[in-house]
């Protein structure tokens, strides 16, 4: 039986002891409890292989007389040794599929990435940008000016050969990226309303900040039709359908070698990449002030992480198509799901989960550090004042949110409490008058 699982009448149940507290939102799991070679940590095996590799480099390989190459290789080797330690020794998170070591690996990558960000934060602006040349010699140069926005006509009568050329120009690689991105984000958040709010809010942020970053300047139909309705909306819809299937699925697991047929074995291998159990997230932001503030905080951090993607490219001089940008997105896809589960557990069962999970803590620290790098490297761009009408819209929105918060969690509660006290007093007075009238009758 693996760590983080609890044995029930039919085998291990769920991913932790909190199952009994969330019986209505977590699926039942049936497992024969088979603990095979695949599930072991293999600490001694990894240590032996690591020692042999280091011994080979030390005793048999001649060290090159290239200081820059040796420095890079030494840093990479140090990171690999840390990853080997973390994958075998770090604490398991809430997920166990496809393998706990997979999620331990991404936890350790989070630590490495945060340390890298801290290093960049403590450099001068020029040194930090030039340091990127050690990762890729093509980096460290200012980005070329690009034309964004432009002609926003859906049908351009001036172009007789292709009047819909503006639409075709927008159908690039970012369209499937938006779709799959929001499909995966929906699997992380597991709530239609939160996904739609984040999607729409980010488009408003692009409108508000296009005077700072030119690539935020898009046509209205690109914002609301291409992004919100088609790409994001379709990704959220498919994500919700997948969530519905996962919540209805029966989680019944059997050891690979206990399955008699080859077809059954292949099916079991494929399903190894599906969740071990499933928890339906019920955020309930209006149920209490604590949950409302927590959900608002989650949305804020989510939007900040999205903005960091664009601002980091801008201040560190990375072109949008660079592989480091893609690697960062892959990183957040893998750590985001774990972080959201840890946050939900922390909110939903604070008596058992007394502290925020390790992956959620690291994701919050990474998001904050990325933003601090943006602030340090280009404060001028960040301090460009918003247009007056944009400022008015945001002030109005903030006032509406604060007003609703005050009404829902303070004024409404006070009013309901006053009505309840008044009702109790009236009932008490009625009972008292009834007793007096009965006494007069006798």
From Swiss-Prot:
The name this protein goes by in its record: Phosphatidylserine synthase 2
Topological region Cytoplasmic: 1-40, 96-104, 313, 376-381
EC number: 2.7.8.29
Any one GO MF annotation of this record: L-serine-phosphatidylethanolamine phosphatidyltransferase activity
Family the UniProt entry places it in: Belongs to the phosphatidyl serine synthase family.
Pfam families from the UniProt entry: PSS (PF03034)
Organism: Gallus gallus (Chicken)
Subcellular location: Endoplasmic reticulum membrane
């Amino acid at each position: 039986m693996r760590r983080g699982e609890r044995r029930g009448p039919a085998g291990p149940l769920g991913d932790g002891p909190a199952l009994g507290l969330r019986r209505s939102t977590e699926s039942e799991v049936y497992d024969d409890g088979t603990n095979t070679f695949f599930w072991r940590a293999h600490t001694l095996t990894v240590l032996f292989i690591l020692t042999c590799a280091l011994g080979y480099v030390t005793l048999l390989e001649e060290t090159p007389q290239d200081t820059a190459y040796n420095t890079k290789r030494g840093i990479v080797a140090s990171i690999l040794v840390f990853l080997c330690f973390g994958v075998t020794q770090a604490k398991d998170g809430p997920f166990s599929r496809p393998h706990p070591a997979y999620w331990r690996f991404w936890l350790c990558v989070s630590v490495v990435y945060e340390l890298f960000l801290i290093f960049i934060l403590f450099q001068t602006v020029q040194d930090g940008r030039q340091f990127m040349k050690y990762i890729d010699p093509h980096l460290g140069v200012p980005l070329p000016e690009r034309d964004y926005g432009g002609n926003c006509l859906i049908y351009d009568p001036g172009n007789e050969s292709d009047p819909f050329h503006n639409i075709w120009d927008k159908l690039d690689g970012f369209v499937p990226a938006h779709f799959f991105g929001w499909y995966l984000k929906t699997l992380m958040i597991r709530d239609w309303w939160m996904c739609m709010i984040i999607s729409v809010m980010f488009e408003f942020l692009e409108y508000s900040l296009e005077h700072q970053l030119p690539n935020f300047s898009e046509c209205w139909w690109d914002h609301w039709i291409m992004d919100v309705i088609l790409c994001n909306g379709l990704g959220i819809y498919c994500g919700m359908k997948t969530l519905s299937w996962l919540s209805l699925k029966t989680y019944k697991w059997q050891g690979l070698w206990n399955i008699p047929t080859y077809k059954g074995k292949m099916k079991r291998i494929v399903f190894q990449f599906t969740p071990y159990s499933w928890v339906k997230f019920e955020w309930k932001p209006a149920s209490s002030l604590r949950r409302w503030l927590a959900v608002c905080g989650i949305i804020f951090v989510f939007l900040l992480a999205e903005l960091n993607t664009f601002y980091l490219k801008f201040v560190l001089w990375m072109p949008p198509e660079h592989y480091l940008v893609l690697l960062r997105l892959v990183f957040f896809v893998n750590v985001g799901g774990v972080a959201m589960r840890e946050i939900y557990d922390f909110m939903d069962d604070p008596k058992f989960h007394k502290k925020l999970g390790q992956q959620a803590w690291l994701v919050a620290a990474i998001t904050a550090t990325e933003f601090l790098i943006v602030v340090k490297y280009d404060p001028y761009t960040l301090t460009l004042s918003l247009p007056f009408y944009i400022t008015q819209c945001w002030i109005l929105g903030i006032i509406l949110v604060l007003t609703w918060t005050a009404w829902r969690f303070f004024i409404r509660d006070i009013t309901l409490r006053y009505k309840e006290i008044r009702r109790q007093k009236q009932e008490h007075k009625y009972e008292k008058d009834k007793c007096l009238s009965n006494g007069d009758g006798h």
